[in-house]
């Protein structure tokens, strides 16, 4: 961690094996997301305690049905627990590996680039960003795009040719 950057405690759980998503890679992506959010300044936080869980189709579907009332597996599902009085943001991020892989193929993106985007998206949700209202969505998407650009990844919201 560089001086002035938010601290990160990251736990990773593998309900499914996914060799393309090692802990070091998820940590790196989460760090970029935290640095980007800190620079954005919308959410006041000093550190983050996050859990990332990689799941299969069945668990992804069950969690999405239980918590969002939608009977299908989604790509990323985030549980935000807020920022405590000491400035630590907490959240759980669930990434459904089969959905991620399918979307990457369908959108003609690399698996790693799409996984990077979904991880950053989940971290921003864990910090309190949302995209329900148009204004919030524009801000969150713009921040995701800036973070990804710093990592050399193209804007995920542009349509592929």
Swiss-Prot record:
One of its GO terms (molecular function) is zinc ion binding. Binds 1 zinc ion. Its EC number is 3.1.-.-. Signal peptide: none annotated. Its cofactor is Zn(2+). The keyword Metal-binding applies. It is an enzyme of class 3 (hydrolase). Zn(2+) binds at residues 121, 125, 131. It comes from the Bacteria. InterPro entries: MetalPrtase_cat_dom_sf_prd, YbeY, YbeY_CS. It is found in: Cytoplasm. One of its GO terms (cellular component) is cytoplasm. Keywords: Cytoplasm, Endonuclease, Hydrolase, Metal-binding, Nuclease, Ribosome biogenesis, rRNA processing, Zinc. GO terms for biological process: rRNA processing. Single strand-specific metallo-endoribonuclease involved in late-stage 70S ribosome quality control and in maturation of the 3' terminus of the 16S rRNA. HAMAP family: Endoribonucl_YbeY (MF_00009). Belongs to the endoribonuclease YbeY family. This is Endoribonuclease YbeY. It comes from Bordetella avium (strain 197N). The lineage of its organism: Bacteria, Pseudomonadati, Pseudomonadota, Betaproteobacteria, Burkholderiales.
């Amino acid at each position: 961690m560089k001086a002035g950057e938010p601290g990160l405690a990251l736990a990773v759980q593998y309900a499914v094996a996914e060799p393309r998503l090692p802990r070091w890679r998820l940590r790196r992506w989460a760090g970029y997301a935290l640095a980007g959010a800190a620079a954005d300044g919308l959410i006041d936080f000093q550190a983050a305690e996050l859990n990332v869980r990689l799941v299969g189709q069945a668990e992804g579907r069950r969690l999405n049905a239980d918590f969002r009332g939608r009977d299908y597996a989604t790509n990323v599902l985030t549980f935000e627990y807020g920022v405590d009085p000491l400035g630590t943001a907490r959240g759980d991020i669930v990434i459904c590996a089969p959905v991620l892989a399918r979307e990457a193929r369908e959108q003609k993106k690399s698996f790693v680039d799409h996984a990077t985007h979904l991880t950053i998206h989940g971290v921003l949700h864990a910090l309190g960003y949302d995209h329900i209202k148009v204004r919030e969505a524009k801000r969150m998407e713009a921040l995701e795009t800036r973070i990804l650009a710093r990592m050399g990844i193209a804007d995920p919201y542009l349509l592929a040719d």
